[in-house]
Amino acid sequence: MKIFRNNIWENHLQSVVPNEVKWSYWNDCFPIPDGEVCFNVMTGSLVLMSNSEYENLLKAKECTSKLWELGLFADVKKDEYREWLNTYREGKNDESFLDLTFLTSRQCQFKCTYCFEGLKPKKDLTDETISHIKSFLEKRKGSFQKLQVYWFGGEPLIGYNKIITLSDYIIRFCDNNGIEYDSSITTNGYALTRERCEELVKSCRISRYVITVDGTEEVHNQRRPLLSGKGTFKTIWQNIHWLVDFGAHVVFRITIDKENADNIPLLLDKIAQSSLAGKVSIALARTFEILNTPEDLGSKVYSEREFAPVEMKLIDYAHSLGLMNYRLPHKAPLGGCLRKGDITIGTDGEIYKCLDTIGEMKWVTGSIDKIDSEPQPQWYKDYLNWTPDDSNQCRGCKLQPLCSGGCPHNAMFSDKMHGSVLQCPDWKPNYRLQIERYIKEKIEKNEFDLL
């Protein structure tokens, strides 16, 4: 048996092995040419065994301490699924970790060909909302130990001064109260300058920047021009270099459909041949068609089934250039986006639970100034009570601890303004292929332990 990854998530399993054990419910096993893969989604351990080893383990009534530590076996008396489901329910009430998204502006200076937001209102984060955000945090002082802030829009940099003002307060608040702080931004990257890059990274402590680049210069400029029609690629490319120079982690988000898929390898070549190689991350995303997207988009987008091989081919190519690693999925926070501490705050203080519903008033759950006293709409109460066990698609799936049931909004409701209408996470279609390639690479490098 080859061990490629040990228990990294459930260290309590390094205890005494019980007298009676069973094969863990959370073992996701599948064959590859080299044998049988077993990935335990609760512990994160990953092993490869021969077919005979696998058959023998399935029949085993006892196990070694190492197999127990890996999580491949569980106490025979334990209902692993029900125990996880109860933990999931408890996780929804966890407010020790606040995950706040701020919409600094609903405006945008781009005219992207696939934009979902339609006519963008001229709204920026109000001073009154900023005051209410401060009060919200002050009231919760001492109840949480970590704060993650996401800056979003529209285009959040249109509200640049709001980011500066609110960041200054939040950083002082966290430092004075011993709260761990982390901050990220999703931006088109155009309104940055060298001075702004330095201020955002060093003063505002925004460490992660998700910036969409949809191809090489000609293709990107066709898809993501300014409202005036002017191209944006050169400016964004320079700004990304400045961010990296100041120590930021930049993620190239590449939105892919049938119009630009063939151009993406050329973009990857450009990144690999630049000083950005090894310093940035790549995130491949499928273009979605939904509600407010342009009418002619339908024939250009990939279905989930169509996109999976396209994505895997690009992952392989990016890997060959040293731009991407084959990835094993991470565990989602217990309770997922249903957690009480996970909210999105709009420009006027309105609260959403899902980024994909921004701008639709029917999905507003309340307001930041009355969050503890305002009556909740019935749909929201039902939403908060949802668990993966309520979904036919989730029930019986062994990947639940990794995705926390995926998107509960898509599981319960059929309409929203934008984003995927699928419940499952976007990494799922190529999940096993990535594991297979990960194992093959580790074998070639002789990076594994034997048992």
Spans of features found by a protein language model:
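Local cysteine-cluster metal-coordination motifs and their immediate loop/turn environment
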Residues: 107-117, 356, 391-410, 426
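N-terminal pre-triad scaffold of radical SAM enzymes
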Residues: 90-116, 134, 141-150, 345, ...
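Radical SAM enzyme [4Fe-4S]-AdoMet core and its adjacent flexible, acidic
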Residues: 2, 218, 222-237, 241-340, ...
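Conserved glycine-rich "GG(E/T)P / GGGxP" loop and the immediately following alpha-helix
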Residues: 101, 105, 118-284
